[in-house]
Amino acid sequence: MYAVVRLRGQVNVRYTIEDTMKMLRLHKVNHCVFLPENPHYKGMVQKVKDYVAYGKIDAKTLAEVLENRGRLEGDARLTEEYIRENTDYDSIKAFAEAVVEGKASLKDVPKLKPVFRLHPPRKGHAGIKRTVQQGGVLGNHEENINVLLHKMR
């Protein structure tokens, strides 16, 4: 499962890239979505790689984001009780592990908003104009996306 975080704004962005961002539901800076690994999403993420940070997320980080930033319709927080009552899982951590393994989907939680609004990272970005290979934060982080998401919790 991919975590994709928008890091750059929409000024001077080509229409096709902005359209792809809308399809991914990344309308604003510091918004995050979780996507399954398939060729369709992989191509879309590859197209917007110069405006986002992405990588493979682990269960611990997914549970942390769901607990801290998960919102239901009406801007209510996602709680352990809500997960227990509305899914087959006992906790957010168990649900996150099932999602990462592919046994469950975020759509299994009724009324869960698909976009997670994150804080800017603590201690700042390494630079939003450069890729990870050049010392910035844009592009494919692979497993290190978990560090960025922890900073943005």
UniProtKB/Swiss-Prot annotation:
<protein>
    <recommendedName>
        <fullName>Large ribosomal subunit protein uL30</fullName>
    </recommendedName>
</protein>
<comment type="similarity">
    <text>Belongs to the universal ribosomal protein uL30 family.</text>
</comment>
<dbReference type="Pfam" id="PF00327">
    <property type="entry name" value="Ribosomal_L30"/>
</dbReference>
<dbReference type="InterPro" id="IPR018038">
    <property type="entry name" value="Ribosomal_uL30_CS"/>
</dbReference>
<dbReference type="GO" id="GO:0006412">
    <property type="term" value="P:translation"/>
</dbReference>
<dbReference type="GO" id="GO:0000463">
    <property type="term" value="P:maturation of LSU-rRNA from tricistronic rRNA transcript (SSU-rRNA, 5.8S rRNA, LSU-rRNA)"/>
</dbReference>
<dbReference type="InterPro" id="IPR039699">
    <property type="entry name" value="Ribosomal_uL30"/>
</dbReference>
<dbReference type="InterPro" id="IPR036919">
    <property type="entry name" value="Ribo_uL30_ferredoxin-like_sf"/>
</dbReference>
<dbReference type="GO" id="GO:0022625">
    <property type="term" value="C:cytosolic large ribosomal subunit"/>
</dbReference>
<keyword id="KW-0689">Ribosomal protein</keyword>
<dbReference type="InterPro" id="IPR016082">
    <property type="entry name" value="Ribosomal_uL30_ferredoxin-like"/>
</dbReference>
<keyword id="KW-0687">Ribonucleoprotein</keyword>
<dbReference type="InterPro" id="IPR035808">
    <property type="entry name" value="Ribosomal_uL30_euk_arc"/>
</dbReference>
<comment type="subunit">
    <text>Part of the 50S ribosomal subunit.</text>
</comment>
<dbReference type="GO" id="GO:0003735">
    <property type="term" value="F:structural constituent of ribosome"/>
</dbReference>
<dbReference type="GO" id="GO:0003723">
    <property type="term" value="F:RNA binding"/>
</dbReference>
<dbReference type="InterPro" id="IPR005997">
    <property type="entry name" value="Ribosomal_uL30_arc"/>
</dbReference>
